Regions:
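Canonical radical SAM enzyme core domain
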Residues: 1-14, 31-77, 83, 87-109, ...
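Structural preference for beta-strand elements that scaffold enzyme active sites
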Residues: 25-27, 52-54, 80-84, 120-122, ...
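Short helix-loop-beta connector
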Residues: 20-24
Length: 205
């Protein structure tokens, strides 16, 4: 894959408006989206057209290298911008087992910087640690409290605990009755309401 450019994003935003698609939020993910030098401009373009923007980041050096641009965007768009920081576990050793050694403290430093500057914050965690959701949320709550991070660990929109996917396991089919039992409408789940844009190397867009 290759990085999207500001021109790429502008064309897709034009298409959204031209087709009157019911889009309210533009999300940027990766890899690490802050590795893309065009990200601040793409954020400004998206927010300037009235969309909310969500960045999924590890909050490490690439993000901190763009502090000035982030503060400028925040000053103009405030609550319309959310940064969701990936913290794979509330325990440093487990987080580093996935992210690599010496990744915990840089992430915490980035998270604190975002909190200190009153950015709209969320956290994404994983559920691969053989602990209950309640235990995980209590662990993250303790982490947030210890670092002065104003995130409600009981709010599933602010602390998103993603289920694990095992490519080796068969996945049961979902029937209409399953949706009724769960009290969920199929049209409300993410894959029914979200679309991803990716750019292949060598492609125009």
């Amino acid at each position: 894959l290759a990085y999207l450019s500001l021109d790429d994003v502008g064309r897709y935003l034009d298409e959204i408006e031209r087709q009157s698609y019911p889009v309210s939020e533009i999300a940027f993910t990766g890899g690490e989206p802050f590795m893309n030098r065009d990200l601040p401009d793409m954020l400004s373009e998206s927010l300037g057209r009235g969309y909310r923007a969500l960045i999924l980041t590890n909050a490490m050096k690439p993000m901190l290298n763009k502090r000035r641009q982030l503060l400028d965007i925040q000053s103009r768009h405030g609550e319309a911008l959310t940064l969701r920081v990936s913290i794979d576990s509330h325990e440093p050793e487990k987080h580093e087992a996935i992210r690599g050694v010496e990744t915990w403290q840089p992430m915490i430093s980035g998270l604190r910087w975002l909190a200190d500057n009153e950015f709209n914050l969320a956290v994404a965690g994983r559920t691969c640690w053989e602990e209950t959701e309640e235990t995980a949320r209590r662990g993250y709550a303790a982490l947030f409290a210890a670092n002065g991070i104003a995130i409600d660990a009981d709010d599933p929109a602010r602390l998103v605990l993603f289920p694990e996917m095992d490519a080796l396991r068969d996945v049961p089919e979902i029937t209409v009755n399953c949706w009724d039992i769960l009290g969920i409408k199929p049209e409300t789940i993410m894959c029914a309401t979200s679309r991803m844009v990716a750019k292949r190397k060598g492609a125009d867009a």
